[in-house]
Amino acid sequence: NNEWGKAEESLEKALKLSNRHPQVLNYLGYSWLKYNMNTDKAAAMILEAYEKDPNDGVIMDSLGWVYFKTGDYDNAILYLEKASELNPQNAIISDHLGDAYWFGGRKNEAVFQWKQALSQKEEQEELNAKQVKNKIENGLKNIKKLSIQDEKIKKNLHSLNDITE
């Protein structure tokens, strides 16, 4: 939509002005993923943000979301669980973790996370509560998976150190 176009333009300017600040990289990359746009650039930006600030829960959520959107549910769960540990009151992270659990075959845990998301204060205004309630009632259907074309980005995603070590 037109509002997103203006926001995207502002974020790209902020990225240059901020010397590729991890929060700006993450926000623009995540926004592109959210709108199913520029998948390779989005993943590269989120990876760069993660390399610059690997202990930021919101950035870790975005990295988990890259894995989720590309169908790698095991790694999505790994990073989203860590993001949830770092930001235990974040409704969006709980919602994302619920989605990953659902497609990872962990249905009860998914429903628990979605219910958690509805009661959490942080990022509540960003949460689509009606959509989350629908997921609690009906689960999730198949989603459109995004694919990363750039081999270097794929390699970087697959070579990240296991965060559980």
Task: State the predicted function of each range.
Residues 1-13, 35-48, 70-82, 105-116:
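Structural signature of tandem alpha-helical TPR/SEL1-like repeats
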Residues 22-31:
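Amphipathic alpha-helical repeat scaffolds of TPR domains
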Residues 37, 108-165:
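Terminal, low-structured helical/coil segments at or just beyond the last alpha-helical repeat
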